[in-house]
Structures are given as structure tokens and as C-alpha cells.
Amino acid sequence: MHTVAKDVKLQIEFNPSQVQAYRLIGYESRLLKDEDFNNDAKDAGEMGAGHSVTAFYEVVPVGVESNFVNKVDDLKYQKKVKPALQPTTGSKELLTVKLRYKAPDEDISKKLELPLVDNKGNNVSSDFRFAAAVAMFGQLLRDSDFKGDATYAQVIAMAKTALDNDEKGYRREFLRLVETADGLKQ
């Protein structure tokens, strides 16, 4: 591997006027403490030329009912403390991605920030659809509490929409694997 960046760290900040709750899917054991994001002494991952990283979040938009958003009664003996962070109302930004990395021969990191506006799922790439199908399959295999109403048929249908970039046949092999798992489950 030819390293192009070392100590690569990613931090996602969701806009509370758009998102009431979120959950990182996978990577639970690789979470970085907030204070370690800016700490150049804290080791993180390396990125090689041509490599990419994908992280999936389950997002509950503001105003959407969810069984996974905890509703807590007001406290009787304590006053509700005003949160330090206030939602940015009026902003169409869904989140901001913060990326920190060091060049291979440097010891001081650089930070990039990129806001993301929700496009309501329009123009989703086939790579994203395929990765989402793989993530859904993982939730089914683990029988995750968060799998919701997901089915093997949905995984297959989503993956089939993402077969256009499959020169080596890996995506078709994934489909066969899901079909086999579905057959074993029945």
C-alpha cells in the first residue's frame, strides 16, 4: 500500500434542526473520543492511494416518530438546563463532515470541513446503493434490533440496482450470497 495520508480522522456533526437522532452503523468499536479529533498525538487510520472509506449513519429527521428516540419525562427536582448548542434554524445543511489527516511525511494535521445538504435521496450513486445493501445484509445476519422491517428481498432488490460497476463480478457474487442466506433462513 502506498500511503497518501496518515492518522486520518473523521467527525460528523449533525444539524439538530434537521436531525433529532442518529446512529453509526458498524464501527462501534472504533469510535474516537471527541477531544481526540484535534489531538495530533492520537493515532488513527492510514489511507492508501485509491482507497476509500464508507460510514453509514441511521438518521431520524426532526418531526419523525421513532421507537429508538428516547422520550424522557421532565425531572421533578431539577430545572432543565438550556443546552450549550443551539440548532441552526433555517439552514438546509443536514450535517458537516470534518476530516483531519497528516501527509505521510508530516507530523501536523490539516483539517477539511464540508457541509452536506440533504438531496432527499436524489442522484444516489450505484456504489452507495450497493454499500447500503451490504450494510442492510449485515444487520439481517446479526438480527440487529435496528434492522426494522428489512428483508433479504429488499437487500437483493437494492443490490440489483447497483450492478453497473461490477467488472470482477464481486457484486453478483454478493447477490448469490444473499440469495443463499435467504434460502437458509426459510
Residue ranges and their predicted role:
Residues 65-178, 184-186:
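Conserved functional hotspot residues or short segments at active or partner-binding sites
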Residues 1-91:
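Acidic, polar loop-rich interaction surfaces within structured domains
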